[in-house]
């Protein structure tokens, strides 16, 4: 019996070694650890200067990333933030849903700010699904029908496009570049499906088909089989960075459902959205804002509907890049971060916008949840009703009341600011590798 166990053990070890040795490099991932707007784009921009390829794996132009490079502020919605690095290839993966008019509008706006030669360094998956204008109309109608129970959607058509994908009548980029007659038939079919469900929407089919025929030659230079491209890159030792859109608490499975987006914006979405196996994943970087914000509706346990919330909103310029709506603000939430770390397996943390807390005499941190009955929770609530019934217990930490904006060395931060970082680190049992104290990439401090 002992011989059998040893043989099986060797087989297992050989299998494991065989699978991992196929690739000469790993894929590092940057994920939002809260409800979005954590500053992922800035972290990606910082790391993109050291990698060969940057990828988007899910979501659409409902995401918003702001990057400041060489004094110029770029706003990205579909383009990966890594496009500011001219030596880097940017990939829009199969899990992304693409509204072509918005994509090319975004390209033009950023070219006007100095972003050049994208045709040489942007690749779009032929398997990515298309978002059409009628998807956006339906999105707005569905939100309006909910009345006071709206989900806070961006009305960019993301949910309806993923619905089309799930019901197997969506249209992919590769189909646009194939036989246009077949594309036209599929387009008419999907329009008719939506008209049966939403008779009031207006779609000029001929005009839309003419518009998309114009897009064929425009988009063709960018389109490739990204799955093959990425696996070849890994076998050749190329370094790859993935920029997650949205954030863990907006994940369709793990977020505060139904106040979520329509894709998997946790680590699982990276694998399915790019066609990567689990053993290719290296570092998983959780980006954590030094306080908590949320755009739109839904539960928010540590929200501060008072002067603290107003101060955070004002000092942090908390306005959505995509929606232009004011973000709701509150204290840092440790139970929430423990939960998203559980799901994503963060190997390190980047804390952003620490400088926004500079003026506060004391800072609260939510450290545990308890029910109204007084019982402490040992898990993150899975339903809205349960989450609405909890009370947050806070730790109170002393503030530092001095500017950190121009500090570039962790040991030069005020002692209480360092203690705030170390407190988060100890609570999550995940090392904090970077701390951000400003807008540009130069404001990110290396902790270790």
Swiss-Prot record:
GO cellular component labels: cytoplasm
Protein residues bound to substrate: 321-327
Cofactor info, note text: Binds 1 Mg(2+) ion per subunit.
EC number of this enzyme: 6.3.4.4
BP-aspect Gene Ontology terms: 'de novo' AMP biosynthetic process; IMP metabolic process
Protein residues bound to Mg(2+): 37, 64
Pathway membership: Purine metabolism; AMP biosynthesis via de novo pathway; AMP from IMP: step 1/2
Residues noted as binding GTP in the record, renumbered to the chain: 36-42, 64-66, 327, 353-355, 436-438
InterPro entries assigned: Adenylosuccin_syn_GTP-bd, Adenylosuccin_syn_Lys_AS, Adenylosuccinate_synth_dom1, Adenylosuccinate_synth_dom2, Adenylosuccinate_synth_dom3, Adenylosuccinate_synthetase, P-loop_NTPase
Cofactor(s) demanded: Mg(2+)
One Pfam family of this chain: Adenylsucc_synt
UniProt keyword terms in alphabetical order: Cytoplasm, GTP-binding, Ligase, Magnesium, Metal-binding, Nucleotide-binding, Purine biosynthesis
Localization terms from the record: Cytoplasm
Binding site for IMP: 37-40, 62-65, 154, 168, 246, 261, 325
Top-level taxonomic group: Eukaryota
Active-site annotation: 37, 65
GO MF annotations, alphabetized: adenylosuccinate synthase activity; GTP binding; magnesium ion binding
PANTHER family hit by this protein: ADENYLOSUCCINATE SYNTHETASE (PTHR11846:SF0)
The protein's assembly and partners: Homodimer.
Role description: Plays an important role in the de novo pathway and in the salvage pathway of purine nucleotide biosynthesis. Catalyzes the first committed step in the biosynthesis of AMP from IMP.
Family per similarity comment: Belongs to the adenylosuccinate synthetase family.
Protein's recorded name: Adenylosuccinate synthetase
């Amino acid at each position: 019996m002992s011989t059998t166990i040893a043989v099986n053990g060797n087989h297992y070890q050989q299998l494991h070694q065989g699978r991992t040795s196929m690739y000469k490099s790993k894929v590092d991932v940057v994920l939002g650890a809260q409800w979005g707007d954590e500053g992922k784009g800035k972290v990606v921009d910082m790391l993109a200067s050291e990698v060969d390829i940057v990828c988007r794996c899910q979501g659409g132009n409902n995401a918003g990333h702001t990057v400041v490079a060489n004094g110029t502020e770029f706003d990205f919605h579909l383009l990966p933030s890594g496009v500011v690095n001219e030596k880097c290839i940017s990939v829009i993966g199969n899990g992304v849903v693409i509204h072509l008019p918005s994509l090319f509008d975004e390209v033009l706006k950023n070219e006007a700010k100095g972003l050049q030669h994208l045709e040489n360094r942007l690749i779009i998956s032929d398997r990515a699904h298309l978002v059409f204008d009628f998807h956006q109309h339906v999105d707005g109608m569905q939100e309006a029908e909910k009345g006071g129970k709206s989900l806070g959607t961006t009305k960019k058509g993301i949910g309806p496009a993923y619905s089309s994908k799930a019901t197997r009548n969506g249209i992919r980029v590769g189909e646009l570049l194939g036989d246009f007659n077949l594309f036209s038939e599929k387009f008419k079919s999907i329009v008719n499906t939506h008209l049966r469900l939403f008779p009031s929407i207006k779609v000029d089919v001929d005009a839309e088909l003419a518009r998309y025929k114009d897009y064929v030659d425009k988009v063709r230079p960018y389109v490739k089989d990204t799955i093959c491209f990425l696996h070849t890159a890994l076998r050749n030792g190329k370094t790859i960075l993935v920029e997650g859109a949205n954030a863990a608490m907006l994940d369709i499975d793990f977020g505060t459902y139904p106040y979520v987006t329509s894709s998997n914006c946790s680590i699982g979405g990276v694998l399915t959205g790019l066609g990567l196996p689990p053993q290719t994943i290296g570092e998983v970087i959780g980006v954590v804002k030094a306080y908590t914000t949320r755009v739109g509706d839904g539960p928010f346990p540590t929200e501060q509907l008072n002067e603290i919330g107003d101060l955070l909103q004002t000092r942090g310029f908390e306005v959505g890049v995509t929606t232009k709506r004011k973000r709701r603000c509150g204290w840092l939430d440790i139970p929430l971060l423990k939960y998203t770390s559980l799901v994503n397996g963060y190997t390190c943390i980047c804390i952003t916008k620490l400088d926004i807390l500079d003026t506060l005499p004391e800072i609260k941190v939510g450290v545990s949840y308890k029910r109204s009955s007084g019982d402490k929770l040992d898990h993150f609530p899975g339903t809205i009703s349960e989450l609405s019934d909890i009370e947050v217990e806070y730790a109170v930490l002393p503030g530092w009341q001095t500017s950190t904006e121009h500090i570039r060395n962790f040991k030069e931060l005020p002692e209480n600011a360092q203690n705030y970082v170390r407190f988060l680190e100890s609570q999550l049992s995940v090392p904090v590798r970077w701390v951000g104290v400003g807008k540009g990439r130069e404001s990110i401090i290396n902790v270790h």
